[in-house]
Amino acid sequence: MNYTFQYGVVWKNFGELLDGAILTFQLGAVSFAGGALIGLFCAALISYAPFILRLPVHIYVVAVTNTPALIQIYFLYYGLPEFGIRWSSEACLLIGLILNAGAYLTMIMRAGFLSVRRTELEAGQVLGLSVVQQVRYIVVPHIAKSIYPAMANFFIVILVMGTSVGALIGVDELTGQAINLSSVNYRWLEYFTVIALMYVVLTFIASVGLALFGRWAFRVRARIF
């Protein structure tokens, strides 16, 4: 093998890779937060709403979870302009990831709702707790503790695999920056070796942060490692 690694080229452009890493984290965080809101709303509908309201949610979840995220984002980026709707590549990626995360988090949160036993609510009623107090002191802590590890793991999936799809539609997140820079000097191995390590660092930071937050807020350890 006559290939000579030249990481000096990567170091000269490391600032741009760092910008891509920051954008990656921002996209992952916003996508997860938006998806969590959708997931909470849809999980509540599936768990407690009548069939006529549950049906659209079921269709949404089945459609999204049974098609690749890339196809969904391509539809937003390439399909919507055919109908006169044009969004930036960043907007298409963000909306696509939010909708995708919302469907998966709906299933996770629904499992949390189903884990609350009727006897626990009845015990709250016997103690004289109002509906709001039952939700605050019984439902929310129980659900949060049961679903937090799964949600923490899903955030890592969004952060690494979800955001990197944006490189295929021109988003300059971490993978996109590496593709752009390596296409100039053709040092593909160097750039992608470095961003692989950067992804490891990103996920490590996120994992530690989520584990510490889980212990502090819910007294539960997110088993990520």
Where are the regions that the model predicts?
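Transmembrane alpha-helices and adjacent helix-loop boundaries
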Residues: 1-225
